[in-house]
């Protein structure tokens, strides 16, 4: 084998985490190789996950606004509308992202290589190129950012035509009249609310009594209520016995304690698993955990100190924002540059309809720690902006310590929740008191007024 090409840093995977790691290394003046097995840059986030689903979501919201604005007219989607029509902006969005990122990589002198990469030893990478050739590379530091793929259980025959996963869902040609979704996590709930708003009859099934078990229960109850108002159905506490295509027109889902559910299409949304089967981890002295991830420390170092793992490789929460920060931290630590303290408050945003967001402690967590925290609530119907926008069905919760002095957390369900949460994030990072929200003036009319209303509710003013 020829002499390996030497780099300072090799990054495997060009998703959000890998991009940030590579750029951070290059900005420090180091030789960086970024290896990506797909043709495009951005990973599943750009091509099969975040960007496509949010583009479809925006189309659903725009259509809903058209319906509301033209209430006097009989506005309906054509029964045979194609998914591609609803995603007509997606190609432009992806193209703009790809152009921008390619320019960024070139400007920073990063070597972008396409192929499948695996370890030969703890410092050497063997890459199979797209034309079948092989190339070996070596580096002082290696950052693994290979992302994840849908976790499809063996007892559900995903065929990507009738029974789909989140990677193949948007490859459907036509908007289905009915859709069953198995899994009440983030992906399942986001797609359930989007397709329900588009007029599809959606049945969301989960083992838990309520979806999104990690979220504030009051917010989830609010979401489920609005989902069902859109025509959706939630079946909680269910055990799926069998999923099969009947060979004619329906996917049949057999439940243990309920009648079978029939639908044109079915989405399996039971989480994701890290992509590591091609990496030959054993050659580098690495072993995956029982959950199929890699264990890392606060600097994203694995058990082999010069090998780092970031993003979906290290498990939940599967947030692009978290992954990008991990990529940055890993690269800086590998180069002995100041890393800074890890962010203690990472906002969680869920792009359901309506949106949900959380930062800090929710009510349940605060009760475990403080026993009697104070809770302030602001209903969106109390602010003029929500009424103007026709989005009065929302709620902001503010959690404070028992004295009503210190802010502990903020949870929001409703329009612009994923933007609003950053006010709470900034306040938490600065150690703001509840009085802070009362003493400050917010623009009128805005959704941000809900912070002041919730603070007043805590203090009984």
Regions found by a protein language model. Name each.
Residues 10-38, 51, 55-62, 335, ...:
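Flexible, glycine-rich terminal cap/loop adjacent to redox cofactors
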Residues 10-12, 117, 136-147, 182, ...:
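Short hydrophobic core segments
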Residues 13-16, 39, 182-185, 312:
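Glycine-rich Rossmann-fold phosphate-binding loop(s) that bind the pyrophosphate
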Residues 17-24, 163, 188-191, 197, ...:
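Short glycine/serine/threonine-rich phosphate/pyrophosphate-binding segments
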Residues 29, 199-201, 231, 431:
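Glycine-centered short loops/turns at secondary-structure junctions
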Residues 50, 146-201, 205, 234, ...:
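Glycine-rich dinucleotide-binding loop and its adjacent helix/turn
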Residues 159-176, 260-333:
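FAD-site-proximal beta/loop scaffold in flavoenzymes
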């Amino acid at each position: 084998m020829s002499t390996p090409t030497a780099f300072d840093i090799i990054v495997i995977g060009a998703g959000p985490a890998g991009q940030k790691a590579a750029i951070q290394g290059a900005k420090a003046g180091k030789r960086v190789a970024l290896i990506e097995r797909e043709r495009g840059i951005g990973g599943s986030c750009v091509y099969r996950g975040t960007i496509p689903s949010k583009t479809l979501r925006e189309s659903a919201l725009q259509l809903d606004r058209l319906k509301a604005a033209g209430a006097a007219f009989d506005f309906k989607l054509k029964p045979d509308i194609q998914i591609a029509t609803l995603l007509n902006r997606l190609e432009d969005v992806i193209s703009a992202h790809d152009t921008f990122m390619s320019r960024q990589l070139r400007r920073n002198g990063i070597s972008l290589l396409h192929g499948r990469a695996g370890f030969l030893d703890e410092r050497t990478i063997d890459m199979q190129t797209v034309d079948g050739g092989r190339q070996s590379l070596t580096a002082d530091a290696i950052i693994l950012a290979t992302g994840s793929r849908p976790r499809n259980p063996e007892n559900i025959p995903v065929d990507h035509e009738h029974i789909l996963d989140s990677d193949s869902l948007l490859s459907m040609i036509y908007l289905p009249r009915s859709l069953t979704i198995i899994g009440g996590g983030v992906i399942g709930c986001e797609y359930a609310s989007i397709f329900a708003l588009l007029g599809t009859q959606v049945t969301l099934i989960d083992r838990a009594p309520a979806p999104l078990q990690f979220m504030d229960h009051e917010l989830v109850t609010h979401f489920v209520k609005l989902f069902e108002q859109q025509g959706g159905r939630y079946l909680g506490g269910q055990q799926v016995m069998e999923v099969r295509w009947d060979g004619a027109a329906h996917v049949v889902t057999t439940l243990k304690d309920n009648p079978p559910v029939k639908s044109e299409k079915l989405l399996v949304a039971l989480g994701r698993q890290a992509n590591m089967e091609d990496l030959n981890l054993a050659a580098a002295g690495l072993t995956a955990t029982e959950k199929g991830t890699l264990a890392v420390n606060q600097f994203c170092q694995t058990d082999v100190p010069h090998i780092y793992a970031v993003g979906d490789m290290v498990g939940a929460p599967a947030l692009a924002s978290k992954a990008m920060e991990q990529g940055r931290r890993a690269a800086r630590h590998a180069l002995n540059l100041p890393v800074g303290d890890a962010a203690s408050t990472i906002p969680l945003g869920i792009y359901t309809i309506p949106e949900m967001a959380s930062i800090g402690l929710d009510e349940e967590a605060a009760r475990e720690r403080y026993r009697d925290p104070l809770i302030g609530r602001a209903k969106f119907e109390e602010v003029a902006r929500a009424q103007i926008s026709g989005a009065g069905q929302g709620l902001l919760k503010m959690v404070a310590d028992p004295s009503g002095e210190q802010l502990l957390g903020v949870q929001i369900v409703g329009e612009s929740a994923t933007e609003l949460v950053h006010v709470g994030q900034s306040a938490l990072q600065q150690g703001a008191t509840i009085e802070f929200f009362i003493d400050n003036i917010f623009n009128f009319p805005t959704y941000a007024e809900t912070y002041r209303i919730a603070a007043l509710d805590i203090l009984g003013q």
